[in-house]
């Protein structure tokens, strides 16, 4: 089995030792560039980085990075970069799905930003995958940058948990590239859970949780917190769950999104504002069967808009304590009944 593993993978510990307390950034970068079209495996242990490690997007030189469950890439205290620990496709930008090697991935392990670094970014390439990763103490957990194909990045992210650094600028996932799929994710310790500055994205079973800690412990910062901030258009949300953020879902007037089976709740009333959906401009999306649990008689809204006469629709909302709603704007866009539990 030992020899089989070395046939299947480039074993990092044959070249770079973990748990030394020393910077291994340059050694890992050299290992990546010297092993094109290989899967590079990181056994358990801590690997300290003073700067990002970058993989090529060119399919003939691309690599996949696979970490054991308890292998950890951690930013050193001396980290000064405004980038991620791992930058997929950054070493050699490329745009192709035709050349073998275009589909590469990052899988497993732990990325620890040490409160300074971002977790992982997709800088170039097509159809890059990130999965089964634990991302901790980051300013931005995952950053999908402008895609190589006319801004389309086509990334696939699933089974990832993210805990941010509790700053008022922290973001779980930032999407600038189009046409990505995010599924089965848990996010906490951030000010914004998911920020989509692009379109054509599919979001399913995502659960951002707001935690009162660090800069986010201040109520004045809570008021600008958003679980799902959409600044793009034509995005699809299915079974997405906002937990305690001041605003669960925000969108622009240009947004033509579909929200299905959203779940929204607040576990405390300490900050006094509960917004389920907020349109910056007119409301032009479709919301189907949202489940909303308002906590108490605070300033509550199922929908707020900054401009009237939108063409959006809210279908069959299920609301716990509908009597707590103080902004009745949603009635102008309501289709079907409001479903409330009998008391």
Cite the ranges covered by each PLM segment.
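Charge-rich, solvent-exposed alpha-helical interaction surfaces
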Residues: 27, 31, 286, 302-304, ...
């Amino acid at each position: 089995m030992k020899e089989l593993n070395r046939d299947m993978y480039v074993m990092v510990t044959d070249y770079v030792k973990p748990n030394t307390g020393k910077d291994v950034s340059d050694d890992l970068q050299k290992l990546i560039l010297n092993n094109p079209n290989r899967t590079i495996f990181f056994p358990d242990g801590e690997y300290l980085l003073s700067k990002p490690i970058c993989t090529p997007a060119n399919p003939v030189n691309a690599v996949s990075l696979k970490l054991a469950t308890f292998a950890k890439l951690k930013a050193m205290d001396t980290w000064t970069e405004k980038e991620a620990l791992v930058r997929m496709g950054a070493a050699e930008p490329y745009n192709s799905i035709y050349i073998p090697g275009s589909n590469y991935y990052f899988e497993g392990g732990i990325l620890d930003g040490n409160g300074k670094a971002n977790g992982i970014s997709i800088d170039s390439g097509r159809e890059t995958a990130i999965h089964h990763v634990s991302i901790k103490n980051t300013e931005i957990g995952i950053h999908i940058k402008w895609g190589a194909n006319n801004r389309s990045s086509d990334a696939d992210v699933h089974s990832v948990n993210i805990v941010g650094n509790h700053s008022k600028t922290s973001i779980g996932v930032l999407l600038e590239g189009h046409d990505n799929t995010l599924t089965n994710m848990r996010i906490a310790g951030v000010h914004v859970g998911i920020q989509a500055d692009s379109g054509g994205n599919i979001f399913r079973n995502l659960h951002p949780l707001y935690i009162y800690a660090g800069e986010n412990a201040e109520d004045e910062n809570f008021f600008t917190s958003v679980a799902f901030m959409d600044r793009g258009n034509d995005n699809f949300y299915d079974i997405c769950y906002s937990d305690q953020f001041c605003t669960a879902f925000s969108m622009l007037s240009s947004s033509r999104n579909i929200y299905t089976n959203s779940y929204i709740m607040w576990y405390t009333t300490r900050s006094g504002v509960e917004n389920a959906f907020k349109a910056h401009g007119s409301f032009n999306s479709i919301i189907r069967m949202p489940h909303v649990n308002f906590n108490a008689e605070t300033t509550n809204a199922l929908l707020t808009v900054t401009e009237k006469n939108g063409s959006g629709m809210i279908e069959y909302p299920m609301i716990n304590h509908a009597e707590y709603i103080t902004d009745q704007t949603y009635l102008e866009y309501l289709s079907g009944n409001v479903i409330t539990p009998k008391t």
